[in-house]
């Protein structure tokens, strides 16, 4: 596996960790002051940004025939004979 794919996988994993942390923070935030409103808005912007990074890296990985499972594991889709119905998956 080349460094480009490794980097994309690591960026995706980091983005997903940040998404979880931000979602937890946003759920537990109390907005009472103007500063709280600004901070809440900025947290929402950050969350949207990390979601975009996650989605973009997944799209880049799919373009490299790297697929992600529901368990957040990555696999390389290998076409063994040049036919779309004859494929194998290899865990990364």
Language-model features, listed with the residues they occupy:
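Short, charge-rich amphipathic interface segments used for partner binding and complex assembly
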Residues: 28, 34-80
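Non-transmembrane amphipathic alpha-helical segments
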Residues: 15, 19-26, 57
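Ordered hydrophobic segments in well-structured contexts
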Residues: 7-9, 21, 25, 75
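Short, charge/polar-rich alpha-helical segments
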Residues: 1-16
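Short acidic DE-rich linear segments
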Residues: 75-92
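Intrinsic low-complexity/disordered segments
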Residues: 5, 24, 85-87
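Generic structural concept
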Residues: 9-12, 23, 44-47, 51
């Amino acid at each position: 596996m080349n460094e480009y794919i490794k980097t994309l996988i690591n960026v995706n994993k980091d983005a997903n960790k940040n998404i979880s942390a931000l979602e937890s923070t946003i759920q537990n935030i109390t907005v009472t002051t103007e500063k709280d409103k600004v901070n809440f808005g900025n947290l929402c912007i950050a969350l949207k940004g990390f979601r975009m990074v996650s989605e973009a890296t997944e799209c880049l990985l799919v373009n490299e025939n790297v697929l992600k499972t529901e368990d957040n594991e990555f696999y390389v889709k290998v076409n063994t004979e040049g036919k779309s119905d004859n494929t194998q998956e290899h865990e990364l």
